[in-house]
């Protein structure tokens, strides 16, 4: 009598088969989720809402970023002070680049030439030349936390928690071009496609601020609806954390850790249009490149909510690793 394969073996074969299918040329969109209290990145197929892989990268995995071609994924590892390069076809680490200190959230230029990495314990930001495989410039910044790409190959943003501002870096000159005050300790933020508006979440504020980048000043302060007291272990002082513009640039999606929800704002009016319930303590938010799906990392329930952006409803909740933090959707060629 033929023996049945054990469940774990079947699961392993399914993952291998899926990976082989993707490597053979099927174009898919993968959601990568960094598990900050573990050593891994969970990989989810956004078309089926299923886990298709697990990438072991090192303890205290933090940042995720990628160039526009989707061929590589960059991740920062706090415990190792390095930046790792992942081939998105195989989901294997192919390169490790040393950094000058403990890294936080990274950002890549669209062409993948440079990666910006805040160095929290160095009060600085590393500019990494990926082709040269090394840090080529270190700029001073007080308590840096998040880098954000400027949607072009010549500029990058980095937030300063110490100076309560967000700085624009000119990558041609390798120097600061602008410093935009945000009126509080900046957490995640988003930048409009035309480069004129900046939307930032702040510590101890259940809402966000809007700043003019050309004028380098705050132009609006928007409070989210009232919510219960914040009780989230990973983000105890940030009731509003995840913040992202929809791919068409018309809406701002903001997570409320205090209310386990996602709030959608029309950026033309700054008016709330939709509230979506998700998992506990929603941390970060991202979109698939085509705007079809939104995804949220729920740090309080160790899962990720998948949202249909047309119906404005959560359509799946996928279990991931411990303490999910950053997440990024990448369409793999």
Q: What does each model-found stretch correspond to?
A:
Residues 9-17:
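Bacterial N-terminal signal peptides
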Residues 19-333:
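Predominantly soluble domains enriched in secretory-pathway, periplasmic, or organellar proteins
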Residues 1-9:
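Bacterial N-terminal signal peptides that target proteins for export
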